[in-house]
Every structure is written in structure tokens, then in C-alpha cells.
């Protein structure tokens, strides 16, 4: 049966706590000067114990006191004021998460996560509160892929087992969490003592800074607000006190220092319970509400891990073990060898090749002199004062054999090591003297079982994969927009020039002996400009390519008798291109979410239009009579080239005044017009060459003209899921959309040319703007 602790000293505490914790701890607070000049406290007594476990062992609910944290952050009492804007009626979770989000050390992605996902924010705040108290030090990380020499990995199943594995990581490592909390308390000048906090007006400070101050002055806080032998750190460590009573006491302290006026009435009217009177309070009832004492069995029942959490913890432990076994530790660089003395060189020179090298024969230079006294290597000199000076004979350059790679007799093959070759030999500590050139003669090849070992690269995390994918798509998007802007200016400049004058100028500028089959040629003479004189970035070639593609699609579609062979399966080709595009990304892991493309949205609109047309055709009792037209009715005037409209005139002045310049960075984000790369509308000359404007069209019943679809600006919409109006279109995507539309028109319109639903489907994508306003087909 749980007992409620009395207002006085708890006598039952001596029976339930170890003997060494029955004494009242020393409450001395020292100070030390930090490197930055600030004064920090050194808590010399009653210091909190950090969570410490072996690497890979999970932190279970009892270790982090999950029930206490849950009750603190799930309390919905709206009695707090948010710092610094002063918004009232906030609960504790709101003001604590807001303080974390306002920290200068919080990234933009994490800040958005804290503000949008309340449950993920609470999970992170639970760990931050333990770091805030000092229960977790900065040697913990919570992701098995992380490796550091002074870090240990521990999963937290109660917080991580039920989260999305592909989501942005919700728990940062402990050093990063500590940095976020320090930023929340140090970005702005905050009161750093209890007296300074009391002198401030509401809102006095944020809860992160308040908890740091309370932990720093824990002995004073324990003396003022707790009955002995309880102290401030019992709130997060003492499992034999009920989680509910500890959470109430913690929130009582938060409200007292953040919201109260420190009067007797405020202590009695605390929303988390009236304060209690006791010693050291100055006559005020400022002791926290009494605690509920639990037995060991009752304490264990408060924090029970579920089966799924236990399985998750074991899974992560094994994963961590596998990662540590697969990755070798970072090798230490060998010490730089000392210069070989002469006496050691002479000793090694006398050895036969292949002889095992023992340790140094001479421990010092004096031993070498004594050994050389019996040989001819000792040279004596007479000083001017008559004394005799002895020294060893200096060897000749050829004696060192630095240039020669071998001595007389067979010797093992020398193993050369370079920095580029990340061999295990270079990674392992070198034996003494291994850097000497002569010692290297005796280095044999490494054993076979060491040759294949090399450090494996770490796999990228889901967040790193998403960032890399986003970066690639962003680069492609910007390059496509700049390319489209350049093509727009170049096309406007090309259209303002008379074709005969343009091609005549290009032909005159051809060098003598120009051959289009030469490797250095820039293309067919007279069609493409000389890149040394006029750079068009491939706009002209892209234009002719679009004409050829459109012509080939027209001929393939009009080949009803399959005279040119079997018809191409364009749908299959599009699927293969899409599959190749996805494989080119070369990413491991699943793509987070599916983003609809511009072609799929356009296809949905076309399907809706076709359904409406079918419904209209079914409702119509008699087919609409089509007005016959003859070749005479289609006058040459209508098929001739129209005068330049206002848009071309504007483009003319733009091209004439400014000329073509490489688009700047600011131009990269300008809107792209409909006549960019990939527009394949044919002029009347090309249509006459293809048979679309000749008199043989009179045999085909005329078709009404449908309003053309507006030019859709769409690049590959896998970039951030933008709208169709915010993206660019490539030539391949417009080809896919047009092929799909025209292939479907073959099925619905070619066999029923006079049907009301089949009118005007042939060249709907080739008719544009001013011609549609007049009700007459015209071609730019």
C-alpha cells in the first residue's frame, strides 16, 4: 500500500534506501572560471549520477523514468506564460518545446519538425529534459551508425520503437541536444541566479534556463523546497517515489519561479498543489507537495517495457554489434622514425640479406665507440691544444645504397607503400626502424589474410539520401531553367532575322574546305552557326531535332497500312525511359512518397475532356453536319506566313538592343515562356513538306478546332512536388504527353471522323493563340 510522505522528515526512508544515502549530503557549491571567462559552479556534493551503460545496451523505461517524463509533458494545465512574447495560458510542454525551437543551435528542418509534429517534439523534449537536469551526459548517441571514440550507442525503445524509420531523425545525439539547450539559455542575456530570476518581471525566463539554474544551485533548492533527506535530483532519479507526485513537485517548482509573485498567497494557491511549511523557508509555505512512497514492486510496475520495445532494443543491439564488427577502427599514424646513426648503419651493412633483425645492439653511442675501437672505423684527430679527439668514419654515399634497391645476393621483394594504397601494412603501427631505407630491404610481403581487408565506407542514412536527392534535383531544375531562358532569347533573336539572309550569312562564313564529316565540324554547313563566332548553346540543333521528331511521329501515325514496318510502341518506350531515369538516381532505400508528374496531371485532364465528349456524343441523336470545304476555300493567304505579331516585335527589340548574354543567376528563376525548348509546332513550309498543307487534305472531312491546351511549364516534377505552372518542360516530356494524346486520338477519332466527339483532334496541339481567336487555323 502506497504511503503519502508526511510534512516532516520521512522516517521510512531509512528502510527503503541504501545506508550510504541516508546522510544529508554536503551542500557546498564551489566556482571555477571557464575558458570564455564566465564563472561556472562546481557542484561538490549531492551531484546527480549520469546514465552509464555498456555500448549497445538499450535505455529502458525505468532508466529514463519514462512515466515521470510522460506525466510532465502531458499535463495540460494552462498556467504558464511563454517567453519572450508573453503569450499566456500555455502548458509546460508548449513553453519548453518553444524554447528549444527558438535556440540558435536548432536547424531549420528540426525547428519545422518541432512546430509541426507535436508527438515527435514531445519525444525529443523528454530526452532534452534529462540532459537539462544532467542525468544524461554528452557521451550518448541514439543511432547505431554513429561512431566516435568517446561516444556510446544506446537505443531508447520507448521513444524510438513506434516512430517512422524513414522520417527525419527525431532524437539527436546528446552533445547536439546539450548544444541546443545551451543556445536556448545563452542566445539572449538570461538571469543566471535564483535571485536574479526573482527580480525579473513575468515572463522571467524560459524553462530551459530555469532548470539549468535550479540544477546549478541544487543544494540551495533542496534546502528551501524539499524535506530532508529528499533533494532536487530525486525528481528524475528516485524510482521509489511515485511518478505522479514527482511530476507534480517538478511543475510546482516551475510555476513558482516562472509565474508566482513569491508571496504566501501564491504558494498556497499554486495550481499544482499548496506549498508546505518547514525549516529554512523564512516562514513561507514553499516546500513542494508531499511525495508518495512506493515499494520496489510498485516502482517496477510504473515503468514496464512492452514486448515490441524489448524486441526493438534487442534488434538494435545486434545491429550495433554487426556495425562495429564490420568497420575497423581508424588507424593511427606511425611515429616518424629517427635518423639512423652511422654505427647502426655499419652494423646492418655487415648483415647478410634475409637475416632476422634483432633489437639494437648498442644502447648508446659510447657502446658503439667501444665496439669500433677494434676496427678501422675509428678516426683520431689532434686538437690545437694537443688533446686527441676521436670520431667514427663517415660512410660514402654509395655505402648507404639509397639509390640501389638491393645488395649482393638474393633478397626478398621490396614492398612499396604509398598514401594512395590504403594497405593494412600502412594502417598498422610500424615497428621500430621501419622507416629506414636499409631496414625496408628486409620487409617481406604481408600475409595473405591481411591483403583483402580494408575499411568499408559507412552507409548513408535516410536523411543524407534525401538531402543528396534534393540537391541533385535542385541542380537539374536550375540548369534547366537557365537553359530554357537562354533558348527563349536565342529563338527570339533567330526569328527576327530573315531566313534567306540568315542562311546566306551562315554559308558565307563557312571556312574554305569545310567538311561536315570532319570530327572538328560543328554540323551541316549553313544550318548551324559557327560556335567560335556565334554561340547558341545548341538551340538551333534542338529546333531541327524537334522538327524531325514531330515529323517522324506524324509519319508513323499516318502509316495506316504499316508500310514502314510495325508501329512503334511508344507507351512501352516511355515506360523504359522512365525506368532508366529512376535507375540513374542510384539511391539505396525507398523513395519517400510519390510525387505526381506533370504528364500524369495533363493526362487526367485529357481523360476528363474525353469523357465529356463521349457523353455529348451519346446524348446527341444525329451527328452534326460538317461543312465541306474545298482546296479553293483554303486560300494561300491563310497558309502563308503571317506578319510578325506584337510578341515577335517585342522579342525583336529585345534581341536587337541587348543581344544574347549568358543568363545570370537572377535569370535562373525567371518564368519560362511557352515557346521554350521542346516546342515542336511547325510553320507552313514544314507542313507543306510533310503534306499537312497540301491540296490532298480535301479528301479528309474538315475538323473543327478545339482550343489548344496552354503551354504547360513542367520539368520533371519529382523536384519538390511543385505545381505544373512552377516547373519546366523538357522536349522528352512534351513528346510523351503529345504521343499519348495522339495515340488516344487514333483510337477515338480516326475511325469516326465525322462524329461530334471526334472533331478537331488532329492538330489541337499545333494551333495557338491569335489564330484561335479568329477561328482560323494559322501556323507560326
Curated annotation (Swiss-Prot):
Q: Where is the composition biased (Acidic residues)?
A: 676-686, 723-751
The UniProt subunit note reads as follows:
Component of the chromatin-remodeling INO80 complex.
As for subcellular location, the record says: Nucleus
What name does this protein carry? Ino eighty subunit 1
- Indicate yes or no for the key word Transcription regulation: yes
- From which source organism is this entry? Emericella nidulans (strain FGSC A4 / ATCC 38163 / CBS 112.46 / NRRL 194 / M139) (Aspergillus nidulans)
Keyword check for Chloroplast: no
Q: Which UniProt keywords apply?
A: Nucleus, Transcription, Transcription regulation
Please spell out the taxonomic lineage of the organism that makes this protein.
Answer: Eukaryota, Fungi, Dikarya, Ascomycota, Pezizomycotina
Cellular component (GO) terms are: Ino80 complex
Amino acid at each position: 500500500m502506497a504511503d503519502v510522505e508526511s510534512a516532516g522528515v520521512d522516517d521510512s526512508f531509512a528502510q527503503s534506501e541504501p545506508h550510504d544515502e541516508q546522510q544529508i549530503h554536503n551542500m557546498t557549491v564551489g566556482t571555477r572560471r571557464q575558458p570564455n571567462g564566465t564563472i561556472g559552479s562546481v557542484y561538490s556534493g549531492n551531484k546527480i549520477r549520469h546514465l552509464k551503460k555498456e555500448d549497445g545496451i538499450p535505455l529502458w523505461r525505468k532508466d529514463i523514468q519514462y512515466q515521470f517524463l510522460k506525466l510532465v509533458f502531458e499535463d495540460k494545465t494552462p498556467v504558464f506564460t511563454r517567453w519572450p512574447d508573453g503569450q499566456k495560458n500555455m502548458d509546460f510542454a508548449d513553453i519548453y518545446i518553444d524554447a528549444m525551437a527558438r535556440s540558435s543551435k536548432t536547424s531549420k528542418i528540426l525547428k519545422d519538425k518541432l512546430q509541426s509534429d507535436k508527438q515527435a517534439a514531445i519525444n525529443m523534449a523528454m530526452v532534452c529534459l534529462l540532459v537539462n537536469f544532467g542525468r544524461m551526459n554528452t557521451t550518448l548517441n541514439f543511432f547505431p551508425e554513429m561512431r566516435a571514440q568517446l561516444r556510446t550507442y544506446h537505443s531508447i525503445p520507448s521513444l524510438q520503437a513506434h516512430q517512422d524509420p524513414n522520417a527525419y531523425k527525431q532524437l539527436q545525439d546528446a552533445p547536439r541536444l546539450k548544444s541546443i539547450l545551451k543556445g536556448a539559455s545563452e542566445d539572449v542575456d538570461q538571469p543566471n541566479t535564483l535571485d536574479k530570476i526573482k527580480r525579473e518581471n513575468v515572463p522571467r525566463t524560459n524553462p530551459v534556463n530555469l532548470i539549468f539554474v535550479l540544477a546549478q544551485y541544487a543544494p540551495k533548492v533542496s534546502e528551501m523546497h524539499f524535506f530532508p533527506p529528499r533533494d532536487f535530483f530525486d525528481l528524475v532519479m528516485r524510482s521509489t517515489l511515485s511518478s505522479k507526485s514527482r511530476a507534480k513537485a517538478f511543475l510546482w517548482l516551475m510555476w513558482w519561479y516562472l509565474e508566482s509573485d513569491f508571496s504566501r498567497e501564491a504558494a498556497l494557491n499554486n495550481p499544482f498543489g499548496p506549498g508546505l511549511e518547514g525549516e529554512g523557508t523564512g516562514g513561507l509555505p514553499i516546500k513542494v507537495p508531499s511525495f508518495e512512497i512506493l515499494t520496489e514492486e510498485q516502482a517496477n510496475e510504473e515503468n514496464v517495457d512492452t514486448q515490441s520495445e524489448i524486441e526493438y532494443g534487442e534488434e538494435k543491439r545486434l545491429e550495433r554489434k554487426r556495425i562495429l564488427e564490420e568497420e575497423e577502427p581508424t588507424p593511427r599514424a606511425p611515429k616518424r622514425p629517427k635518423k639512423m646513426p652511422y654505427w647502426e648503419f655499419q652494423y646492418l651493412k655487415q648483415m647478410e640479406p634475409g637475416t632476422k633483425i634483432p633489437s639494437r645492439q648498442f644502447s648508446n653511442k659510447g657502446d658503439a665507440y667501444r665496439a669500433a675501437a677494434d676496427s678501422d672505423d675509428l678516426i683520431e684527430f689532434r686538437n690545437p691544444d694537443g688533446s686527441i679527439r676521436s670520431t667514427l668514419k663517415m660512410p660514402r654515399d654509395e655505402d648507404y645504397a639509397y639509390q640501389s634497391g638491393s645488395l649482393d645476393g638474393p633478397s626478398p621483394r621490396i614492398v612499396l607503400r604509398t598514401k594512395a594504397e590504403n594497405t593494412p601494412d600502412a594502417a598498422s603501427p610500424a615497428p621500430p626502424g621501419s622507416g629506414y631505407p636499409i631496414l625496408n630491404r628486409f620487409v617481406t610481403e604481408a600475409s595473405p589474410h591481411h591483403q583483402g581487408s580494408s575499411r568499408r565506407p559507412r552507409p548513408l542514412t535516410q536523411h543524407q539520401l534525401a538531402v543528396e536527392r534534393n540537391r541533385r534535383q535542385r541542380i537539374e531544375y536550375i540548369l534547366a531553367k537557365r537553359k530554357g531562358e537562354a533558348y527563349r532569347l536565342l529563338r527570339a533573336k533567330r526569328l527576327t532575322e530573315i531566313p534567306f539572309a540568315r542562311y546566306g550569312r551562315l554559308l558565307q562564313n563557312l571556312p574554305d574546305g569545310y567538311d561536315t564529316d570532319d570530327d572538328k565540324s560543328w554540323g551541316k554547313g549553313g544550318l548551324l552557326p559557327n560556335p567560335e563566332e556565334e554561340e547558341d548553346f545548341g538551340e538551333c540543333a534542338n529546333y531541327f531535332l524537334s522538327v524531325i521528331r514531330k515529323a517522324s511521329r506524324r509519319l508513323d501515325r499516318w502509316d495506316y497500312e504499316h508500310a514502314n514496318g510495325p508501329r512503334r510502341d511508344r507507351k512501352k518506350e516511355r515506360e523504359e525511359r522512365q525506368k532508366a531515369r529512376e535507375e540513374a538516381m542510384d539511391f539505396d532505400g525507398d523513395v519517400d512518397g510519390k510525387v505526381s508528374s506533370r504528364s500524369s496531371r495533363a493526362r487526367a485532364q485529357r481523360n476528363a475532356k474525353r469523357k465529356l465528349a463521349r457523353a455529348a456524343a451519346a446524348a446527341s441523336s444525329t451527328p452534326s453536319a460538317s461543312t465541306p470545304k474545298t482546296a479553293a476555300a483554303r486560300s494561300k493567304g491563310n497558309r502563308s506566313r503571317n506578319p510578325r505579331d506584337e510578341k515577335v516585335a517585342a522579342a525583336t527589340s529585345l534581341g536587337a538592343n541587348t543581344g544574347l548574354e549568358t543568363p545570370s543567376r537572377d535569370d535562373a528563376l525567371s518564368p519560362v515562356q511557352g515557346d521554350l525548348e521542346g516546342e515542336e509546332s511547325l510553320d507552313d513550309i514544314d507542313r507543306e513538306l510533310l503534306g499537312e498543307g497540301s491540296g490532298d487534305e480535301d479528301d479528309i472531312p474538315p475538323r473543327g478546332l478545339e482550343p489548344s491546351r496552354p503551354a504547360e511549364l513542367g520539368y520533371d516534377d519529382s523536384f519538390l512536388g511543385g505545381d505544373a505552372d512552377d516547373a519546366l518542360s523538357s522536349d522528352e516530356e512534351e513528346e510523351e504527353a503529345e504521343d499519348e494524346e495522339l495515340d488516344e486520338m487514333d483510337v477515338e477519332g480516326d475511325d469516326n471522323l465525322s462524329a461530334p466527339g471526334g472533331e478537331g483532334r488532329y492538330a489541337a496541339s499545333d494551333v495557338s493563340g491569335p489564330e484561335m481567336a479568329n477561328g482560323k487555323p494559322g501556323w507560326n
